[in-house]
Amino acid sequence: MQDSGFKKKDRSTNIPQEQFVYTRGGEHKVMKKVVNSVLASALAITVAPMAFAAEDTTTAPKMDAAMEKTVKRLEALGLVAGYGNGDFGADKTITRAEFATLIVRARGLEQGAKLAQFNTTYTDVRSTDWFAGFVNVASGEEIVKGFPDKSFKPQNQVTYAEAVTMIVRALGYEPSVRGVWPNSMISKGSELNIAKGINNPNMQQFAATIFKMLDNALRVKLMEQIEYGTDIRLNVTDETLLTKYLKVTVRDMDWAHEKGNNSDELPLVTNVPAIGLGSLKANEVTLNGKDADLGSNTTYKVAEGINPNAFDGQKVQVWIKDDRENVIVWMEGSEDEDVVMDRVSALYLKGKAFTDDIVKDLSKSDLDDVKIEMDGSEKSYRLTEDTKITYNFTRFNDPVDALSKIYKDNDTFGVKVVLNDNNEVAYLHIIDDQTIDKSVKGVKYGSKVISKIDADKKKITNLDNSKFSDLEDQDEGKDFLVFLDGQPAKLGDLKESDVYSVYYADGDKDKYLVFANRNVAEGKVEKVVSRNKTDIRLTVGGKTYKVYPDASYSENANKDVKKVNSDLDLISNLDGEEVKLLLDPSGRVRHIETKDAIDDRKPLAIITKGATYNSSKDTYDFTVMTQKGKTQIVSLDQKDIYDRYGVNYDKSNDKRQAFEKDLVELLQPKVVKEDSATDANQTVLLEVNFDSKGEVDKVKVLDSKLKYSEKSTWDKLADEDDDVVGDYEVTDKTAVFKMTGDLTPATGTKRGELKNAGTAKFKDVAKKSDLKVWYSVDEDKGEVQAIFVVDGSGLGGDHQFGMVKQYGTASKQDTITIVTKDGDSVTEKEYKLDGDADDLKVDQDIRRGDVISFTLNSDGEVIVDDVVEVVNNNHIDNTASKSATLMPEDERQKAGIDKLVVARVDEVDGNTISLNYADGKTQKYYTKASTAFIDVYDGLEGIDGVDEGDYIVMIDSADIDGTRFDYVLVVSSDDEIRTQHISTKAVTDFLNKPTRLCTKSWRWGRSSHGTKVNTVNDEAVVDGIVTLPADASVRNFNIAFDQEINSKDATVTVTNEDTLGNVTVSEVATDAKVLSFKTAKLDTTKTYIITVKGLKDKNGKAVKDVTLYVEFVAGV
């Protein structure tokens, strides 16, 4: 079957702390969401220097990223040198002598300072002072003038007024200054944008402030005096300190906007080290600057502090130092070019999502009709035939090949989009920053977590004990580059617990790019949310982090590292635990560290399926339900099963008590509904011990002293207000089990089984007067140990309906978030569960987007045992098993449903919805002001109503008065059907659902070999074959599964849909993966429902019940 295309992304899958970044000319604009990826860090757009605003404070400015770039730029220009260890003293004050030195260098007079060393001008400047020549030159150029006493006071800390005065003089603007010093100079400095908002001009200035002022002055146009005497004439030239004195070629926005130039003529970055390693060194970049008179594809060195990889595919502003090997000392993006950093959501051709067929036929002529949709901003951008595409640092000559590869990988990878003047994509760079444990040479290695780094041997050892040794014979800077948190680094800078991935420059298997990040979140887990098996989230410190299904974890300081492997129980048990989360560049959890074992609890449990001895493993296998409502299959050696005295059942144990029963007999479910002391003592209460993997490693049979009570006596004995049963206290550790289901006793080799076991709240059990109850007590503590409800019903309230949004864990209790009706509105509510979430997620396969019927107990908790899936899957899909499926008609009463209608909306008029059925008939149905409208396929939220062309499911609740519909669920729309290429058959199958009891029809023909069919409603079923024997007196059925099955306890029912009469079934058998059976002769003009229950896999685990709709069509 054709793939339906780029999957529509769930917009709410983005982590809350993420953001979408839009950039124009280096200025970051934070929009809706964040993209913390290798792309956003390694290729991030640099921030343009901001005009400095000094504050009235004595706190030194911090050496932030912007200041660091300023200082690196001044260093590259030869203006500042620092202390040789990367420290430029930005947090220190600066003297008058030091500042005079900076100004002389900025005027290009450093060589003259050497000659002026002995031309002393001031009384306090000696020729032996290191700064003497600079002060003397500054004095000669009238940049400094000293004090009336002929001193210079070189060691005084320079004030803003003094510094701005020297700068204004150096720029030639002193003749234009009018007024009294220092205000006159401060005013002129502000006019020239040297600095703004200085509150205290007499306060000493830190070096960072001075550096910023000097940096701002570099691009100010110089003034020169062309007439002297009484007729003074001044002229502002086209020269600056950069161009006239420092010999710098300037190609920036000022240049682009003067002399008829424009920003399109700025140089284009055509190659960077992260892509062209081998042809480029780590500190080089290639520019196409033909229109800027810089030549075509010229390679330049870049000064320290410039990351050229940030500008690949962009127009850039540059300052090039002409007398130093053409070194670029400053680089920023063009202010007239839009750059978007986001994530890929989908690709479209002429409005339709990419599919296998579209990609197969895609050609370069189609590119003008291709759009790429962003996941964060939800905006789309059109490609052109000239769009350049890079994927994982590999350039593609043919953009069609690139798009095919990106579509095949199909994920929300990080993306950098450079737009042209028409808002079309000029350049596209996409990076897979989310795949973990990948190892494809020439594509990607990782992500991994570092355990040990050996920089000398160039070897990285990972937490999982694997090693990356490919760098051993390579030269750093030539054969491989290292980036840490997006900035160029050295291999020796990496540390234990860094998360890293390795890419390959332009796909070259011998050129490596090591990208590492050091992003850690630590603290107590406040909440655990599970939307599905691949979408699990932890909230720590108020921020929510998504956990990779294959993330690793350790409970003992990384001595033992294991995989999460989508173990929802494992993650749920992190609730309330202190954790350390190692995040990858996209902000997702790559590794989890805990201080203690994730689950060291010992819950109480009852047996729901009796023990059997497994001779092949020498274990006793049985099933229990814990007090949390979790069903657990147990398989233990007898030495791991203990009696009430703490003595195990090992055969060699000579301490075994003679009166202890055989284990198979002992470990059977027992339900006694009358007051019988003998029988009551047979009820087994267990204490179950879980290991660090969440598996049962020990079970203890408890010494339970059971008491019996029933009906009104129980109602008086149990007090929900005081939490007592008679004289015994009910605590938060008291287990309450519902054991009202059918019990099949153990007979011979057949195991006993308790159906529909569950858990309940004491408050619900205590207020009922129609129950039969056993309870066990701890006499020493005066507490109720466990309560067993063996007869009675009605522990829940009215049925409600809603769409599952996600699962979670809070305060050590599983939760479920449901979009549901709340009065006259629709809201998103988080409910606590009275049992285990796995009973819904795993046993019933209820997932995000599914619609359920549920009831609440007196504590407002969802009663797990009462949850019924009403609509499975939240959209119409070409694959039947993935398309919206309704619950069987005969189960709707149990779910509290009076009516269930499926149709396409033909017309909406107020509270009247006209529905167009598949056969063309139209019928009107009515809603009301309180009707809940829920979008279950796209927004996953409440909406105001429905529109023409919507595909809907309407529910009338039996527990809400009136005949108008109470819930309307939108599962698709005409627009969605079109863009996602949904077939007419899939739509027709959906519209036919009200007349079906299941999701798939088998069509049988009068051929002797039978007819294969595709997947039915359960994904475990692969196909089925109906064959017609020669005598035509019976029908042979074969149902094939994708796993080995056991039909020993299975029941097969074949029912005539019209008469609801059952057909005789015989010879039910299993051969590996195939279930076969025979029926009596069937009427080929009728339709039949086949129901298979009680199937198990080869390990004895229950397989979901199967319902098939069989239609006989002659001649097929």
UniProtKB/Swiss-Prot annotation:
Q: Which InterPro entries match?
A: SLH_dom
Can the keyword S-adenosyl-L-methionine be found in this entry's annotation?
A: no
Chief subcellular location equals secreted
- Its signal peptide is 1-53
One GO term of the cellular component aspect? extracellular region
Q: Which residues form the SLH domain?
A: 54-117, 118-181, 182-231
Q: Where does the protein end up?
A: Secreted, Cell wall, S-layer
Membrane-crossing residue ranges in chain numbering: none
* Keyword list, A-Z: Cell wall, Repeat, S-layer, Secreted, Signal
Q: Does the keyword Repeat apply?
A: yes
Q: What is this protein called?
A: Surface layer protein
To which species is this protein native?
Brevibacillus choshinensis
Lineage runs: Bacteria, Bacillati, Bacillota, Bacilli, Bacillales
